[in-house]
Amino acid sequence: DPEMSRGLGDVYKRQLLALPQFAQERKYSTFYEQRATLFEELPVTSKDIIFLGNSITNGCEWAELFQNKNVKNRGISGDICMGVYDRLDPIVKGKPAKIFLLIGINDVSRGTSADKIISEISMIVRKIKQESPKTKLYLQSVLPVNDCYGMFNGHTSRWQVVKQINDLLEPLAVKEGAAYIDLYSHFVEKETGKMNPVYTNDGLHLLGKGYLLWRDIVKPYVDQK
């Protein structure tokens, strides 16, 4: 479908333009295109439960975690709010039962403000509601980060922005009739405001134990009829 491939071309170009121009990042953007084009070919049905987001979503085996083949992974490493917005079509076209969205930390790493991130998430929410009004939407809070590993400094040095996003995300969910799921408070160390090192080995991504905790938090929402 030339229309669809043209659409993806735009997504890909936007990702490419947004990336710092060095070899590793250029290579990374080819992964984005590989995954986005795969998702365009994989059908979504009204029985499906979609986990949508960036590398943190990308990194999990959701169907195995929930022992449910209708739970589908639509995470792409490196994704940002507008990247998710641009690739909604093949998802909402299938009118999935539920969408669990977790997005924003890569926008934080680019210096984007909490207000701007929320405004872009609200565009995602409105598009889902418009194109697939029966889909139940769950907005998951952005996870805390931890700068003690000296990795992903663009993300982890801006750890305070995460709380600002979450403080605005819950009212957005209420306003738009979506459910808000607070992951943040389960993963954060109260005394530092940073990700509990039990759940990460780089300050940004999750270890197996982190995915099990995430599963335990969202399972009631996944199982809800």
Segments (PLM) and residue ranges:
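A short helix->loop->beta-strand "cap" motif at the edges of active sites that frequently abuts
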Residues: S132-K136
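Charged helix-capping and loop-helix junction motifs
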Residues: A114-I124, W159-I165
